[in-house]
Amino acid sequence: MTYLQEASRNAVTVPKLQAMRDAGEKIAMLTCYDASFAALLDRAGVDVLLIGDSLGNVLQGQTTTLPVSLADIAYHTASVARARPAALIVADLPFGTYGTPEDAFRSSVELMRAGAQMVKLEGGEWLADTVRFLVERSIPVCAHVGLTPQSVHAFGGFKVQGKTEAGATQLLRDSLAVQAAGAQLIVMEAIPTLLASDATKQLRIPTIGIGAGLDCSGQVLVLHDMLGIFPGKRPRFVKDFMQGQPSILAAVEAYVAAVKDGSFPGPEHTF
């Protein structure tokens, strides 16, 4: 059995994401961990596939993303890449793998060799030198600000960020700093809608929201969440797109359409 498919659309590249942002076309992003789903998500028109350290939660049963290793991410990145999707492949740098610019470079090289076309790392202003170090060495970078799950213990739990004036000011500083360092994409997680809107207006690069409101350049969800596969209470920023759909493909197509036409997220999914 093969998961390869003939390309039905042009490849989504880093410059393509910038062009989409500049043209006002929303970017649809989902997590992905294997070849089968990579082919399906690509067929549904997803623009970006994220091999997220969320695999620690949804695949490994961990309560946080902290136990996920670089080898874990590399393995799943290679699995996704074998499907040869037109979608851009972005891979997370796990906790503890980018403490210095040199560490980040070594880790990123492993993920790029596995098939990643961009790496994502959590943090803002303090990571500017690392972002610059990677970009200067031809590694595209996606930054992640707001609620950064690898900082769960520092935050005291999974809490909305940027609610205070000081917090909002720092988030804007973080976003502008990583952009100045060369980041080409930025994920904003669990921050007030107005703050995400303000940041998106101030930034030149695309912003991808998850619990950050409608005004971001695009949206991302964990694949399992948007298919209704989550134990316990549904996170506020999640919509179950599987409801009322005849197939997983149809559910993913509905997600892509909702992101593109601006009907997702709704007010009930934001802070």
From Swiss-Prot:
GO terms for cellular component: cytoplasm. Its main location: cytoplasm. It holds the Pfam family Pantoate_transf. CDD domains: KPHMT-like (cd06557). It catalyses: 3-methyl-2-oxobutanoate + (6R)-5,10-methylene-5,6,7,8-tetrahydrofolate + H2O = 2-dehydropantoate + (6S)-5,6,7,8-tetrahydrofolate. Mg(2+) binds at residues 53, 92, 122. GO terms for biological process: pantothenate biosynthetic process. Its EC number is 2.1.2.11. The active site is at residue 189. It comes from the Bacteria. Keywords: Cytoplasm, Magnesium, Metal-binding, Pantothenate biosynthesis, Transferase. Pathway: Cofactor biosynthesis; (R)-pantothenate biosynthesis; (R)-pantoate from 3-methyl-2-oxobutanoate: step 1/2. 3-methyl-2-oxobutanoate binds at residues 53-54, 92, 120. The keyword Magnesium applies. It is an enzyme of class 2 (transferase). It is found in: Cytoplasm. GO terms for molecular function: 3-methyl-2-oxobutanoate hydroxymethyltransferase activity; magnesium ion binding. Its cofactor is Mg(2+). Binds 1 Mg(2+) ion per subunit. InterPro entries: Pantoate_hydroxy_MeTrfase, Pyrv/PenolPyrv_kinase-like_dom, Pyrv_kinase-like_dom_sf. Belongs to the PanB family. Homodecamer; pentamer of dimers. HAMAP family: PanB. Catalyzes the reversible reaction in which hydroxymethyl group from 5,10-methylenetetrahydrofolate is transferred onto alpha-ketoisovalerate to form ketopantoate. This is 3-methyl-2-oxobutanoate hydroxymethyltransferase. It comes from Paraburkholderia xenovorans (strain LB400).
